[in-house]
Amino acid sequence: MPFDPRLQPLTAAEARVLGTLMEKARTVPDSYPLTLNAVVTGCNQKSSRDPVTTLSDAEVQEALDSLRRRAMVVEIGGQRATRWEHNFTRAAGVPDQSAALLGLLMLRGPQTAGELRINAERWHRFADISSVEAFLDELQSRSEEKGGPLVALLPRAPGARESRWTHLLCGPLSAADMAAQAAQAAAPTSSARAADPALAERVAALEAEVAALRGSLAALCGQLGVSLPGQP
């Protein structure tokens, strides 16, 4: 029977552990499957995580054991250490593309279709935003026989340009929960940027590029003897 989050929802720790295994399988295949220590490190890393967690070895082991009982992860014995790999695609009955989107939502929280396409670059290269939306729509319209929807489109928060998607692997959300998630996701903070060095680096690079373009435009306007746009 396909995974039904309404009957057996994941805990927050289980979602983080599962998402971490799914991520590392795609981004660092040479180090996969993962040892317990590697899973803990991946769960608690500060980049590409929202929220940032401080799960203990015991908490991660408990989550792994629970996921194993539901056939969502597999324990692999080894001479030096036990390793773990995910079995989510088969357990949930979803294609790799959908699994990639769900993994990103578990690790990074609610995101727009455009953000998911960018963040999925190392997981799966979607041709365009429309292809991302197509897989999200399939996950949202998942039939009752298959376990019901696995994602939901949050209401657009005030001031936000687009609505964000969230996963339902931890159980259904009430209207109040969805509104709260939408508001929180649409309000990035300086601490959130600091917790994600990769994001801060991208922002700094974009700011530098904009500054360089403005400088080039100012020089060109000077050569032509015209004012810089936006200036008298």
UniProtKB/Swiss-Prot annotation:
Which SUPFAM superfamilies did the record assign? Winged helix' DNA-binding domain
* InterPro entries per the UniProt record, alphabetical: DUF480, WH-like_DNA-bd_sf, WH_DNA-bd_sf
Recorded superkingdom? Bacteria
Q: Which protein family is it in?
A: Belongs to the UPF0502 family.
PANTHER family the record matches: UPF0502 PROTEIN YCEH
Cross-referenced HAMAP family: UPF0502
What protein does this entry describe? Answer: UPF0502 protein Aave_3438
* Source organism of the structure: Paracidovorax citrulli (strain AAC00-1) (Acidovorax citrulli)
